[in-house]
C-alpha cells in the first residue's frame, strides 16, 4: 500500500509546524483582544527561540550518547503535548493574569511556548524517524510540512482574519457612543480602520488546530503499527543495535544503492571517489558538506525568520488584499516546491547554489520594499501589488526547493546527517530571528502605516 504510506507521511509532516503557523496567521484576530497588543509578534519570536532548548537536548543526546535516544517516544510526547496545548489555547487565550502591576496574557504566552517546543523539536525528531521508511517518502513528508503552513492560511482566509474597512472616525465614534469631552477625534473627516467580525471565532480556529494535531498523532501511530506500512519499512536493526554506531549506512556501498538514493554530483568519476570524510557515507568532502550546511542555515534564516518578520511591512502598504494574497500564495508555493522536487530531484550542488542566489534576490526585493514602508515603490499601482505577490511566491518556491533537495541529500548520508540537518534548520532560524528582533522591535527601522490615512506621493 504505497499510497497509504504516502498519505500517512504527508499527514505526519503536516503536524510538524501547523500549530505555530496557525498562531501566526491568527494574530490579526488575537492582537486587538489582548493587553500585549502588537508587541505579541515580538514576544512570539523570543518564545520560539527559547523553545530551541528542545532540539538542543535531542542534538546533544545524539552527539554525546549516540544510540541512547529513540525518536519514537519523543515524538509521541511532543505530539501529545501539541494536542493538549492547542485544545487549552481555545479556551484560555483571552485570559489575563495580574503581573508586576500590569495584566498579561500569561496562559497564551505559556501555551505558545509549549507549542514552540513541540514544533521546534519536531525538526530534529520527525526527519530522523523518516529513515525508517524508503527514500521516496521523505519528499512526501516535506509536502506535508509545507501543507502545515498552507492549511491554517486557507482556513484563516475563510475565517476573514484581517479584513478591514475604513469609516469616518467621527461617525464611528458617535455610533459607538465614545465621543466625549476629552476625545481627540475632530470633524476633520479622518478615516478609522475597523476590522470586521470574523466568520468564526478564534476558539473554533484553535480547536481546528487541535484536531490537526490529533490527525498527526493518528498518522504516526499507523506509520509505526499498520501492517501495510510495516512491509515497506527498512531493516529494524537500524533503530536497535545498529543505531548506536550508525554502521548500517556505512556498510551499504554506493554500488548497491538504488539509483534514486545516489547523491548526484556532476563529476564523471564520482563512482570512483574515495571516502572523503567521516560523516555519513563519506561521499561528500568536508568543504562540500560545509557548503550544504551553510546554505541550509542561510535559507532557513531567510524563510523562517528574516523575511516573515517584515512581511506586513512589505505587503500592507499595497493593501490588505495584497498581504493576504502574498501570505496565502507563498504558503501554496511551499508544497508546490515539494511536488516539483518529488518528480525532479536535481541534486547538483551547483544548481543548489544558483537557486539560493536567485531566491535571495527575490528576498532582497522584499526587504527593500519593507524598508521603504509605508511608501514603497509603485505603491499606488496594480503592478506594485503584482510584483510584491510574485516576489513572495518565487522567494518561497525557490528556497523551499533548495531545502527539500538538501534534505534528500542528507537523507542519503544517514541518520546522523538528518539529525544535524534539523539542528542546522533551527540554528539558522534562531540566528535570523535574533538578528531581526532588535531591528524591528527595538530600533524601529521598519515603519508601519495606517491602512486608511497614510498618504504617499505618486
From Swiss-Prot:
| Intracellular or extracellular location(s) | Cell membrane
Which segments carry the region annotation Disordered? 249-274
Q: What does this protein do?
A: Plasma membrane transporter mediating the uptake by cells of the water soluble vitamin B2/riboflavin that plays a key role in biochemical oxidation-reduction reactions of the carbohydrate, lipid, and amino acid metabolism.
Q: What is this protein called?
A: Riboflavin transporter 2
Segments traversing the membrane: 11-31, 38-58, 73-93, 97-117, 146-166, 204-224, 279-299, 325-345, 349-369, 388-408, 417-437
Single annotated GO MF: riboflavin transmembrane transporter activity
Q: Which UniProt keywords apply?
A: Cell membrane, Glycoprotein, Membrane, Transmembrane, Transmembrane helix, Transport
- Stretches of the chain forming a coiled coil according to its record: none
Cell inner membrane in keyword set? no
Q: What is the organism of origin for this protein?
A: Salmo salar
Q: Kindly give the membrane topology term recorded for this protein.
A: Multi-pass membrane protein
Q: What is its main location?
A: membrane
Q: Which gene encodes it?
A: rft2
Q: Please give the catalytic activity noted in the UniProt record.
A: riboflavin(in) = riboflavin(out)
Q: Which sites does the entry annotate for glycosylation?
A: 168, 176, 182, 199
State the family named in the UniProt similarity comment for this chain. Belongs to the riboflavin transporter family.
Amino acid at each position: 500500500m504505497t499510497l497509504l504510506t504516502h498519505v500517512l507521511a504527508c499527514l505526519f509532516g503536516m503536524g510538524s509546524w501547523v500549530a505555530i503557523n496557525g498562531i501566526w496567521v491568527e494574530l490579526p484576530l488575537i492582537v486587538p483582544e489582548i493587553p500585549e497588543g502588537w508587541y505579541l509578534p515580538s514576544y512570539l519570536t523570543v518564545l520560539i527561540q527559547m523553545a530551541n532548548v528542545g532540539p538542543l537536548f535531542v542534538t546533544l543526546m545524539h552527539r554525546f550518547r549516540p544510540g541512547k535516544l529513540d525518536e519514537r517516544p519523543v515524538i509521541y510526547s511532543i505530539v501529545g503535548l501539541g494536542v493538549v496545548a492547542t485544545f487549552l489555547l481555545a479556551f484560555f487565550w483571552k485570559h489575563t493574569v495580574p503581573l508586576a502591576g500590569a495584566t498579561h496574557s500569561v496562559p497564551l504566552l505559556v501555551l505558545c511556548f509549549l507549542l514552540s517546543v513541540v514544533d521546534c523539536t519536531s525538526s530534529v525528531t520527525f526527519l530522523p524517524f523518516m529513515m525508517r521508511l524508503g527514500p521516496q517518502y521523505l519528499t512526501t513528508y516535506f509536502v506535508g510540512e509545507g501543507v502545515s503552513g498552507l492549511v491554517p492560511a486557507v482556513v484563516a482566509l475563510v475565517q476573514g482574519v484581517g479584513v478591514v474597512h475604513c469609516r469616518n472616525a467621527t461617525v464611528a465614534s458617535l455610533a459607538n457612543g465614545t465621543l466625549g469631552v476629552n476625545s481627540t477625534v475632530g470633524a476633520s473627516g479622518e478615516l478609522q480602520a475597523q476590522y470586521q467580525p470574523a466568520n468564526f471565532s478564534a476558539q473554533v480556529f484553535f480547536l481546528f488546530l487541535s484536531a490537526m494535531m490529533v490527525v498527526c498523532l493518528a498518522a504516526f501511530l499507523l506509520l509505526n503499527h499498520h501492517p501495510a506500512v510495516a512491509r515497506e519499512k527498512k531493516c529494524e536493526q537500524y533503530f536497535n543495535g545498529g543505531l548506536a554506531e550508525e554502521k548500517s549506512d556505512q556498510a551499504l556501498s554506493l554500488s548497491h544503492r538504488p539509483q534514486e538514493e545516489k547523491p548526484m554530483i556532476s563529476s564523471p568519476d564520482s563512482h570512483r571517489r574515495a571516502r572523503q570524510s567521516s560523516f555519513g557515507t563519506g561521499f561528500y568532502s568536508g568543504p562540500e558538506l560545509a557548503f550544504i550546511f551553510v546554505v541550509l542555515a542561510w535559507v532557513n534564516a531567510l524563510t523562517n525568520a528574516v523575511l516573515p518578520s517584515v512581511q506586513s511591512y512589505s505587503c500592507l502598504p499595497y493593501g490588505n488584499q495584497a498581504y493576504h494574497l502574498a501570505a496565502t500564495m507563498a504558503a501554496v508555493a511551499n508544497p508546490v516546491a515539494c511536488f516539483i522536487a518529488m518528480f525532479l530531484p536535481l541534486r547538483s550542488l551547483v544548481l543548489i547554489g544558483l537557486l539560493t542566489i536567485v531566491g535571495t534576490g527575490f528576498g532582497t526585493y522584499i526587504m527593500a520594499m519593507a524598508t521603504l514602508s509605508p511608501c514603497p515603490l509603485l505603491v499606488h499601482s496594480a503592478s506594485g501589488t503584482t510584483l510584491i505577490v510574485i516576489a513572495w511566491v518565487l522567494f518561497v518556491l525557490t528556497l523551499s526547493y533548495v531545502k527539500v533537495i538538501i534534505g534528500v541529500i542528507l537523507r542519503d548520508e544517514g541518520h546522523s546527517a538528518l539529525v544535524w540537518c534539523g539542528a542546522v534548520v533551527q540554528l539558522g532560524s534562531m540566528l535570523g530571528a535574533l538578528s531581526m528582533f532588535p531591528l524591528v522591535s527595538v530600533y524601529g527601522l521598519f515603519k508601519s502605516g495606517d491602512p486608511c490615512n497614510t498618504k504617499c506621493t505618486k
